[in-house]
Amino acid sequence: MNLFKYFREEIIKSVEAIVPGLDTSKVTAEPPREVSHGDVATNAAMVLTKAAGMKPRDLAEKIAEVLRAHPAVTGVEVAGPGFINLRLADSFWFERLAEVLAAGTAYGQSDLGRGHKVNVEYVSANPTGPMHIGHARGAVFGDALASLLVKAGYDVTREYYVNDAGSQVDVLARSAFLRYREALGEEIGEIPEGLYPGEYLKPAGEALAKKHGPALKDKPEEEWLPELRGFAVDAMLDMIKGDLAGLGVRHDVFVSERGLVEAGKVQDALDYLTAKGLIYEGVLEPPKGKLPDDWEARPQTLFKATEFGDDVDRPLKKSDGSWTYFASDIAYHLDKYRRGFGAMIDVWGADHGGYVKRMQAAVKAVSEGGGDLDVKLCQMVNLLKGGQPYKMSKRAGTFVTLRDLVEAVGKDVVRFIMLTRKNDAHLDFDLDKVLEQSRDNPVFYVQYAHARCHSVMRHAAGMWPDAVGPVPGVEVLAHLTDPAELGLIRLLAGWPRLVESAAEAHEPHRVAFYLYDLAAAFHGLWNKGKDDTSLRFLIEDDRELSLARLGLLRAVVGVIASGLGIFGVAPVEEMR
């Protein structure tokens, strides 16, 4: 139950009882900024004052009068110019705690997105080598966002777009051919400039030698290049999939750019736009500032991107007559739309920020306004050790591999830390700090809360065999009267709202912030028990109170596990 949604409906009912027929779409119910102000705050009187023909405070008092009769409400205050703050009965919170316990890790599951399909495309790295640390953040972000949307009830497809039609694939094929010759015993010396130098291509060369023997060695390029394009791309994709699997990242669909081109879908998309009058031959204005050396005023095939919010119209063909990347991307997004995805989310690196407007313009054009593209840009990750910039050993060319990072600190640590900042903010990843056992290390702090709960439950099972059997009912949970206990229940009851708001905003980092706050509230209660023995979770001569507190711990365990599940992180029952 999203209690804030529930009370929004109750507030709207109270408004209807006073002034029927008002537009209540702007009415909100949310946690007050200050905990001391109550449990639920609403702007109803402020946003409806004009339509109701009443002063805000007068309307607020009338709404408050109706709400005071609600059985879960113990107090209603009108604050400032007309804000309304509600205080809820302890019994209401005990019912919410029972709800958490009944649902377990399914608590927070929502039907917000029921009936809505969403395509989340992430990673989509060029298939020219292994994954590196620069790919890790977008991979984890996209995977966690997809899981968050599933938790909120959306029908999600996780997609990877394989850029296998560009000139870089020819370079990859030639690089693989060089490693093939090496596998046959030829001394290749230094890798020529323009080819990929990484050791990671050696297995591809060896596989080619095993498959063909020396048969390809003396053939002209035009005979072996077509086969090696596909072979090398497949080899690199297998490597990438292995890297992603090591990070716990998965995709449902891999879409080939070359497949789109060969199926005529690029031409089809441009024919569609031409029929709509959105493609023309023209000459672009020179770019502002210093002109690039290779810029020339020449007629080009252009898309009318400015009609859909872009700054300039965009070229669709290169000077050699081949399609631009943008033309292929238009076809790809039209293909997504025709597969039933009106809602699309693309996760890109921050260096692609200048590409956002044109892509959103293209989606508007090909979907005639029916499609929506949200582009999430992931900023750089700064790798540190002991607070200083750090470069790990490089086993694959000139970059740090994702596999190196996962081997150094573990999959779960990488995933959690990558989600502790908003995607468009720079992230520091300190190899020492992420392994510290302190509250400054969020992944440890959250996991420690989960493990501590399990430690208490194991101890309780030794005291009372049925201590962690059936979940306690409301009458037992009513023994939780300490303000810190009630505060923890309020935090747990806010999880469904957090899931929905994070899903709507496409911001999984909110889950990390919430889990940290939940862990802090739990650790605070634990520490109170060290100072005051009456607040310990287990009191041998008060079984009922102990069972109530065990119920609270079981709820904390369920919600932490639920949040970590969204992140693809396994909750631990013991710290090692």
Curated annotation (Swiss-Prot):
Q: Which gene encodes it?
A: argS
Q: In terms of domain of life, where is this protein from?
A: Bacteria
Query: Do the record's keywords include Calcium?
Result: no
Q: Which UniProt keywords apply?
A: Aminoacyl-tRNA synthetase, ATP-binding, Cytoplasm, Ligase, Nucleotide-binding, Protein biosynthesis
List the SMART domains: Arg_tRNA_synt_N (SM01016), DALR_1 (SM00836)
Under which EC number(s) is this enzyme classified?
6.1.1.19
**HAMAP family on file:** Arg_tRNA_synth
| Reaction(s) this enzyme catalyzes, per UniProt | tRNA(Arg) + L-arginine + ATP = L-arginyl-tRNA(Arg) + AMP + diphosphate
From which residue to which does any coiled coil extend? none
Q: Name one GO cellular component term.
A: cytoplasm
Query: One biological process GO term for this chain?
Result: arginyl-tRNA aminoacylation
Pfam hit, one: Arg_tRNA_synt_N
Transmembrane intervals: none
Where in or outside the cell it occurs: the entry states: Cytoplasm
Q: State the organism of origin.
A: Paramagnetospirillum magneticum (strain ATCC 700264 / AMB-1) (Magnetospirillum magneticum)
Protein name listed in UniProt: Arginine--tRNA ligase
Query: Family assignment?
Result: Belongs to the class-I aminoacyl-tRNA synthetase family.
Motif ('HIGH' region) on chain: 125-135
- Asked if the keyword Membrane belongs to this entry, the reply reads no
Q: How does it assemble?
A: Monomer.
